[in-house]
Amino acid sequence: MMSFVQKVSLFILAVFQPSVILAQQDALGGCTHLGQEYADRDVWKPEPCQICVCDSGSVLCDDIICDDQELDCPNPEIPLGECCPVCPQTTPQPTELPYTQGPKGDPGSPGSPGRTGAPGPPGQPGSPGAPGPPGICQSCPSISGGSFSPQYDSYDVKAGSVGMGYPPQPISGFPGPPGPSGPPGPPGHAGPPGSNGYQGPPGEPGQPGPSGPPGPAGMIGPAGPPGKDGEPGRPGRNGDRGIPGLPGHKGHPGMPGMPGMKGARGFDGKDGAKGDSGAPGPKGEAGQPGANGSPGQPGPGGPTGERGRPGNPGGPGAHGKDGAPGTAGPLGPPGPPGTAGFPGSPGFKGEAGPPGPAGASGNPGERGEPGPQGQAGPPGPQGPPGRAGSPGGKGEMGPSGIPGGPGPPGGRGLPGPPGTSGNPGAKGTPGEPGKNGAKGDPGPKGERGENGTPGARGPPGEEGKRGANGEPGQNGVPGTPGERGSPGFRGLPGSNGLPGEKGPAGERGSPGPPGPSGPAGDRGQDGGPGLPGMRGLPGIPGSPGSDGKPGPPGNQGEPGRSGPPGPAGPRGQPGVMGFPGPKGNEGAPGKNGERGPGGPPGTPGPAGKNGDVGLPGPPGPAGPAGDRGEPGPSGSPGLQGLPGGPGPAGENGKPGEPGPKGDIGGPGFPGPKGENGIPGERGPQGPPGPTGARGGPGPAGSEGAKGPPGPPGAPGGTGLPGLQGMPGERGASGSPGPKGDKGEPGGKGADGLPGARGERGNVGPIGPPGPAGPPGDKGETGPAGAPGPAGSRGGPGERGEQGLPGPAGFPGAPGQNGEPGGKGERGPPGLRGEAGPPGAAGPQGGPGAPGPPGPQGVKGERGSPGGPGAAGFPGARGPPGPPGNNGDRGESGPPGVPGPPGHPGPAGNNGAPGKAGERGFQGPLGPQGAIGSPGASGARGPPGPAGPPGKDGRGGYPGPIGPPGPRGNRGESGPAGPPGQPGLPGPSGPPGPCCGGGVASLGAGEKGPVGYGYEYRDEPKENEINLGEIMSSMKSINNQIENILSPDGSRKNPARNCRDLKFCHPELKSGEYWIDPNQGCKMDAIKVYCNMETGETCLSANPATVPRKNWWTTESSGKKHVWFGESMKGGFQFSYGDPDLPEDVSEVQLAFLRILSSRASQNITYHCKNSIAYMNQASGNVKKALKLMSSVETDIKAEGNSKYMYAVLEDGCTKHTGEWGKTVFEYRTRKTMRLPVVDIAPIDIGGPDQEFGVDVGPVCFL
């Protein structure tokens, strides 16, 4: 529940929150806008693309929306002061002279590489892919398929039911799916040959022809310039082990070692025997440090040294001569990687590859430079106890070694000679108190001797033999508790825990206060390539290119250099919600604070700076487990579930023609850094090598590549429990819990009238003790009291000065593991540290393994037409053609001597075929052949150019409401709210302490100070506070706030539109509700029909029916469109809204409803008798289709610009039958200003037997 103060704040914000940008002016009807005064109904344009109107003292402004009609000019211009582009006046261009193409020249020498272009502006983010199916929960209990429905109930993604008619007239449902294709008709008869048509546009490029024979070898080109230096090679393999060096010289004494790790806690010692009281001896001089022991056995071989730094890059090799061009090879491999693209969504984690084979054991390399500090590995297993070595001779002081990491604890060795005093170790936890020994007799107190003069330092004595092991001494008296240590260094972040089981859905928590705006994080690394975007709109068709002769395919060109980034494209439609990003790294653990007792609330002080990180304190004892808390309030609905996998890949594009051979490109930019390779298995341990001589410091090499991470070590023993880390980042929200059962609605009680003033009540109970008075003057000193009992033990004193370091004690035996403590209370979250500076760039990693193939890319845009190719080689001789027609008649020979008429001879043999005649004209088109069997699948050609854009399709039906978008950035903290009302008086406090110190204080007290004069106080208040009135007012205000925050669609509490009503009350059914889009006075609210399935707001026309009759009679029927409301007798334009309200009220509410909506739709049903509404069945065209008039007085037609085309859901008026039929029109648009329809204009009317009527459907906004 929301507190009263919060609700009052929301009430005040809601009252003063304007819902629409309006400038409310004085009540005289005039308006003032931007310092200019306007009269009522004045219209002006403050900007070229904005128009405003003064409406009864209110300024309504709207943007001018240009028609989406395509202009038939390449570069439209916007005139000065106008908003929409127009085609400029162009002058005819001079015609170009024809030209002939010369032979192809030799390739020129490569130019010098150009300067790197300036980076282009960042492109608009691509549209995310469609959401995929929900993921599968591996650890969830098995559930039936129906249990996912609660997760999607909040999105209202439901199957569309059969549309119910809107009373009182029915509305046709959505069109059914298209029927199956009919069988092909029989071939028609051959028609007469048509006349020659005009020259058609160039056809689509044909399939590429077969590869021609390779051309002759070209001339060898001149040698190119030497290439740039290559990138450094990968690090070489470790070299062979060198010869052992000579023993080094004696090094300087090393620095004192770091304090050793804290030893295991020893066992409790036995009670010692009672000692004899000895005389206190004089303090002996400090002995000289003993000689170092002999070096022990050589230890096992150390781990393989770190990888050495890579050597300097080699010089560039000589540039070889260009070889002769070979034959055209197959499609080459992908070119070098381009520059890194914009970051895309993270891909899914791939499966771990199989472990590689164990490599051969390499020789240990030379020791590399010390690397950066790595993360601490897991503790190794406990090694075997070492053997006790025999005491060796004193060795020379060795060189200072590099401090090693703490090794595993060895077995308990023999006690060594007492060493020199080391630095004080870390303070250990206090041991358990030992048993008290028997009290010894006190020795005689010696006299204090005089300080002697310090003697000269004697020479070091010879090393004594090792003495026998002494008995362990008795435990000392437990020391006083030490001061609290400073906080420890920040611990390393713990590894990610296993995912917990899915918890039950929590109840709704109360909203927390807004946190301060966090500092800007470090710049993240570039993401991987994004998922394929939505398919782009087809481009404008290019001008037809000239037909070039197909040339032979050229040799494969080398990849060219990356071009400069193109300009940013236009902003695309907003995409659906993308995949969620990967889980961020765990935050660094915060400081553990002690849980203090809750103090009284203080006034908020200014935020202090973050303090330095302190040293770690000793771990406290585990507290008892807390009681289980009460369940919290119901939680808010969870965030949207994870999107599914990527959608199916699109169809492959058509193959395109091969382009001409490109020039040789310069060297490409280096590709993005690859991922680290899979680490190999750990090789076997090599034999220990002898200690080499210490070499001089070598020159600093270039920074080497970061080596792959080593294999994980064997699991160590159980480590000490680490400090509690900072709370990690908030995990992903769990799935929303199941929807609770609907509660029974309680009856709303009417507000009671204020009761009559009651009689004055009886005297109330004694009030709580008043505030403490001012302190009195200091009294006289009293007599000394009797000595009190012994006090409890005092707290630890201040820390004394540091004592001399004691000798190192024997390491105690390891103690047993303690029982795990109970879970401590959760400490308060630490203060947020300041953002650290961005870390230095890490070394470049080695090349990663090739990634998996990316998803199928989208079809590319149509490339620019290529230049005409070179002339092809002559084709092979074709097969002989069919015999030609008879040749032309030969010329007449000279006249012969006339012979006698002979008898007709017998028919001769067929003569030899004549020569091939000229090619005849093309015959008429033959009948369509039968469908052939599908051919074999051809080889995949290169992608073809994109076809010209098709006509705009009809508007689709509105899709379901998409899922809620991602949570926006956190807003800035709002201003402080007004002070809340004073709270109710609290209950009476507990009785104060009585009488001081008990029975002993009943005696005579001390004399008090002399009193002051009279004190004047206020008269008692006559009128008591009436809590009933206050509670009644609070309840009334609370109800008003609830109504503002959650309107119910009633006349007294209207909503802005049906979509808001659906979000606030998803349980409501479709029906009539009250809305007030302009959020003004409730008296101008309008009643609408709410479709709760989609959230649409529907207004009915008034009247909604045009009667069926003969509305228009003329002799020239069917010649032009006639508007029903403008031209026909008795006709009217369609109006919408409540007829009882003034016309301007409905217009204003409709204007605001358009602003609050993103799309609109409306159906018009035309009833016909011998009148064609859309398709003329006789002619097969739509020349007699009627027109609709939009609210902005533009025609909505059957053909033309698709933005102004209606759809036809049912067409029953295609011919004159003498019977009534109907045609249903539908218009959907995202330009809400175009609806509703205000008039209709049929064309096939005017005859005495032609009648029509209209049903105007409701206009629906979403």
Curated annotation (Swiss-Prot):
| Compositionally biased spans, kind Pro residues | 119-134, 167-190, 202-216, 895-904, 976-993
KW ATP-binding (keyword) present: no
- Which parts of this chain are annotated as the region Nonhelical region (N-terminal)? 145-164
Region of interest (Disordered), residue spans: 95-143, 160-1000
What residue stretch is flagged as signal peptide? 1-23
Low complexity bias (residue ranges): 102-118, 192-201, 253-264, 276-295, 339-376, 534-549, 631-640, 672-684, 723-738, 781-790, 802-817, 828-838, 927-940
Record propeptide residues: 24-150, 1018-1262
According to its UniProt record, where is this protein located?
Answer: Secreted, Extracellular space, Extracellular matrix
Which keywords does this Swiss-Prot/TrEMBL entry list? Calcium, Collagen, Disulfide bond, Extracellular matrix, Glycoprotein, Hydroxylation, Metal-binding, Repeat, Secreted, Signal
PROSITE patterns, alphabetized: NC1_FIB, VWFC_1, VWFC_2
Q: Is-annotated flag, keyword Calcium? A: yes
Q: Which residues carry this modification: 5-hydroxylysine?
A: 262, 283, 859
Q: Which InterPro entries match?
A: Collagen (IPR008160), Collagen_Structural_Proteins (IPR050938), Fib_collagen_C (IPR000885), VWF_dom (IPR001007)
According to the entry, every stretch annotated as the Fibrillar collagen NC1 domain falls at: 1028-1262
Give the residue ranges for region: Triple-helical region.
165-994
Cysteine pairs forming cystine bridges in this chain are: 1058-1090, 1098-1260, 1168-1213
Region span, Nonhelical region (C-terminal): 995-1003
**Top-level taxon of the source organism:** Eukaryota
> What does its PTM field state?
Prolines at the third position of the tripeptide repeating unit (G-X-Y) are hydroxylated in some or all of the chains.
GO MF terms on file?
extracellular matrix structural constituent conferring tensile strength; metal ion binding
Q: Name one GO cellular component term.
A: extracellular region
Q: Which family does it belong to?
A: Belongs to the fibrillar collagen family.
Task: Describe its partners and assembly state.
Answer: Trimers of identical alpha 1(III) chains. The chains are linked to each other by interchain disulfide bonds. Trimers are also cross-linked via hydroxylysines.
The text the record gives for the protein's domains is: The C-terminal propeptide, also known as COLFI domain, have crucial roles in tissue growth and repair by controlling both the intracellular assembly of procollagen molecules and the extracellular assembly of collagen fibrils. It binds a calcium ion which is essential for its function.
What's this chain's function?
A: Collagen type III occurs in most soft connective tissues along with type I collagen.
Q: What is this protein called?
A: Collagen alpha-1(III) chain
Organism, by scientific name, is Gallus gallus
Q: Could you tell me the gene encoding this protein?
A: COL3A1
